[in-house]
Design a protein with these regions (language model features):
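Short alpha-helix immediately C-terminal to the canonical SAM-binding loop
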Residues: 36-38, 119
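S-adenosyl-L-methionine
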Residues: 40-66
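Class I SAM-dependent methyltransferase "Motif I" SAM/SAH-binding loop
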Residues: 7-9
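Conserved SAM/SAH-binding beta-strand->alpha-helix loop
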Residues: 32
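Class I S-adenosyl-L-methionine
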Residues: 122-124, 129-171
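A short glycine-rich, Lys/Arg-flanked "PGG" loop and its adjoining helix->strand segment in the class I
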Residues: 91-108
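Short beta-strand element of Class I
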Residues: 24-27
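Glycine-rich SAM-binding Motif I of class I
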Residues: 11-15
Length: 171
């Protein structure tokens, strides 16, 4: 299987997943050089055979993958709060259409965010696009144990900020 994280930041989440699940291939996607460099430095020390990093804009995702992805993680994505920026959200209909061509069989997206407006928008967007919400919480850390966290997630939870989460799929 191949799992990707779009907007992986410094890579903490995807690196921890690759270590914990050696039989799954992980691909981290990040658009900013300075950020992905941090992840590259961390991964070089670990010599993981199941983790790959790509510096690219997510708008080009269809040019890189074709019916081979099993799961997409969207962790603490930019909420693009202004109405005119809605199309830039990684859960906008425009992005969901892009994802259609990269999924192998079943479409599967897991999202975590501290931003309730982005969360609500994303849940509605996925439902309108035909996804089923399999699991959902507005307080992930009181709901599940043994969570692999992101750097942002650690920062927010240490301040008492609740993490919104959903797991959605579409056949």
């Amino acid at each position: 299987p191949i799992y990707i994280e779009i907007g992986m930041g410094k890579g903490n989440f995807i690196i921890k997943n690759a270590i914990a699940n050696p039989n799954i291939n992980y691909i981290g996607i990040e658009m900013y050089d300075s950020v992905i460099l941090r992840a590259v430095e961390k991964t070089n020390e670990l010599e993981l055979n199941n983790l790959y990093l790509i510096r690219m804009d997510a708008r080009l995702i269809e040019e890189v993958f074709d019916k081979e992805i099993d799961l997409i993680y969207l962790n603490f994505s930019d909420p693009w709060p202004k109405e005119r920026h809605t199309k830039r959200r990684l859960t906008s209909p425009r992005f969901l259409a892009r994802y259609d061509s990269i999924f192998k069989d079943k479409k599967h997206i897991i999202m975590k965010t501290d931003n309730i407006d982005l969360f609500n928008y994303s849940v509605e967007s996925l439902k309108e696009y035909g996804y089923n919400i399999n699991d959902i919480s507005n307080d992930l850390h009181s709901y599940k144990d043994n969570i692999i966290t992101t750097e942002y997630e650690d920062k927010f939870t240490s301040k008492g900020i609740k993490i919104n989460y959903f797991d959605a799929s579409k056949n």
